[in-house]
A protein has these predicted regions:
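Structural micro-motif
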Residues: 55, 62-70
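Short pre-active-site segment immediately N-terminal to redox-active cysteine/selenocysteine motifs
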Residues: 11-12, 19-22, 65
Length: 98
């Protein structure tokens, strides 16, 4: 939790991918998130949290569906999406929010 708090307060926006290893749509999103991560470069930090392992963090942000992507800037939620989306849509949403 401390590492997560540090990441949240960083200068670089943080995109969190909440997923589960048993979730089919999460497996679909994995390569998409990785592709967008490389497209974003240093503009955004991307991390993944397994909701079964980090239930406290998922609960704190009311993650009810997976996959859920939440974009933070200086500790505040600035964008959120649940479900699968295409790489270009994700990239444009993140760039539009930051």
């Amino acid at each position: 939790m401390e590492k997560f708090k540090e990441l949240l307060q960083g200068e670089v926006p943080l995109l969190v991918d909440f997923y589960a290893s048993w979730c089919g749509p999460c497996k679909t999103m994995h390569p998409i998130v990785e592709q967008v991560k490389s497209m974003l470069g240093d503009k955004v930090r991307v991390v993944k949290y397994d909701v079964d392992e980090y239930e406290n963090i998922a609960s704190l942000y009311h993650v009810r569906m997976i996959p859920t992507l939440i974009l933070f800037k200086k500790g505040k939620v600035i964008w959120q999406h649940s479900g699968v989306m295409r790489a270009q849509e994700l990239f444009q949403a993140v760039m539009g929010a930051i």
